[in-house]
Amino acid sequence: MDCFAETEGKRAHDPLYQRRAAAAATPATGVPVDDVDKVVDVPGAVIVGAGPAGVAVGALLGLRGVAYVVLERCGCIASLWRHRTYDRLCLHLPKRFCELPLRPFPASFPEYPTRDQFLGYLDAYAREFGVEPVFRRAVISAEYDGESWWVYTREVVAAAAGGEQAVLGCTMTVYRSRWLVVATGENAEPVVPEMDGAGRFKGQMMHSSEYRNGDGYAGKKVLVVGCGNSGMEVSLDLCNHNARASMVVRDTVHVLPREILGFSTFGLSMWLLRWLSVQTVDWLVLLLSFLVFGDTARLGIPRPSLGPFELKSVSGKTPVLDVGTLAKIKSGDIKVTPAIQCFQEHGVEFVDGSTEEFDVVILATGYKSNVPYWLKEKEFFSEKDGFPRKGNAWKGQNGLYAVGFSRRGLSGVSMDANNIVQDIVQRLHDMGYERSENN
């Protein structure tokens, strides 16, 4: 029996739907919408986002017999991984820390699976647990009316490309549910900062989400703006393709070896944190990093005053796990530059007064949450950055949940998903519903 009840039609005689459509849809999109075309009642949860987080929650809900629908604005699961990452990307942490609930990675996979291996794992995971998202469905607004969540969506008729916004259709479908799971994650939208004179630059400029590999960059002078994991790896990839790469370092950053003495730095640190304080583990990790790299400040990469794991706990700032970039910096194959003062027609002026010409600028300036743009709720999520106001929070009020916002990567996704599904099942039990679990 179909667990979703659909009510279709223009609803010309229903003022409730007319009022909601006019108030929520038109201002959010700027495109006139006559009214609601369809309302879908979901006797369970609406999950917004079909990345690893949304797929994991859907899989666990399905196993517990709880109805759900996953809404995804793109035409595939894990669209960030599939369409906005560089080809050489591998998981930065060992695979045991990146598994989704109930299914380990295949034993044949390397310790750090490639992007394509991870995507294959996600596709197989979704098939195994029967997670079938509603694709090309953009959520433009979601609000709680005192009883249910109303999630307003429009069909994506043309995907976003080249910095342009996606084109949305004119008909609206509303999903109404008791629970809303926000699974759009920390990296929903690229961050493109305002930079003085950027419009004057006549070379090529792109965000790192558009970069795939170094083919075609040989011999070109490329400036990578940003020194996080993406900036470091893009710079390394460019160097390996014989580009003349430079990397902007405008702030302090912790760079750690991905492995120490054959052990994962992250895994070793997590093991030590069972018995030692964060400050002690930071001291040990930084000592070992110094033995491997030397003083990174001499390379133009100063470290923060707080240790890497203490800094992560108080600010969410993730240390960089080096995969070979620092060796290229030491050899002079990758140049480190200070922050940009302003752009010129053919290059940039740096804050130290020096200037240099570049053919290409790649902005490895990160991503941001898009939750404030569509979720009409101000208590749980911050309007400033689109993250839960309390660190590691996964549960809000009125059946609102967040998965994948803990700044703990894929390991945090699994923890959040398990907590959310257990809470929903307990609420159903408290309401007197008994659902059979799938075997």
UniProtKB/Swiss-Prot annotation:
Keyword Nucleotidyltransferase among UniProt keywords: no
GO MF: flavin adenine dinucleotide binding; indole-3-pyruvate monooxygenase activity; monooxygenase activity; N,N-dimethylaniline monooxygenase activity; NADP binding
Enzyme class at the top of the EC tree: oxidoreductase
BP GO annotations: anther dehiscence; auxin biosynthetic process
Catalytic reaction equation(s): indole-3-pyruvate + NADPH + O2 + H(+) = (indol-3-yl)acetate + CO2 + NADP(+) + H2O
Expression induction: Repressed by the transcription factor OSH1 during anther development. Reduction of auxin levels at late stage of anther development, after meiosis of microspore mother cells, is necessary for normal anther dehiscence and seed setting.
Binding site for NADP(+): G226, C227, G228, N229, S230, G231
Keywords: FAD, Flavoprotein, Monooxygenase, NADP, Oxidoreductase
Disulfide bonds: none
Known EC number: 1.14.13.168
Database matches in InterPro entries: Auxin_biosynth/cation_transpt, FAD/NAD-bd_sf, Flavin_mOase-like
Cofactor annotation: FAD
SUPFAM superfamilies: FAD/NAD(P)-binding domain
Alphabetical list of PANTHER family matching this protein: FLAVIN-BINDING MONOOXYGENASE-LIKE PROTEIN (AFU_ORTHOLOGUE AFUA_4G09220) (PTHR43539), INDOLE-3-PYRUVATE MONOOXYGENASE YUCCA4 (PTHR43539:SF88)
Miscellaneous remark of the record: Plants overexpressing YUCCA4 are male sterile due to defect in anther dehiscence and mature pollen grain release at anthesis. Plants silencing YUCCA4 do not exhibit any visible phenotype.
Membership in a protein family: Belongs to the FMO family.
Function: Involved in auxin biosynthesis in anthers.
Protein name per UniProt: Indole-3-pyruvate monooxygenase YUCCA4
Organism encoding this protein: Oryza sativa subsp. japonica (Rice)
Record lineage: Eukaryota, Viridiplantae, Streptophyta, Embryophyta, Tracheophyta
Chain's gene name: YUCCA4
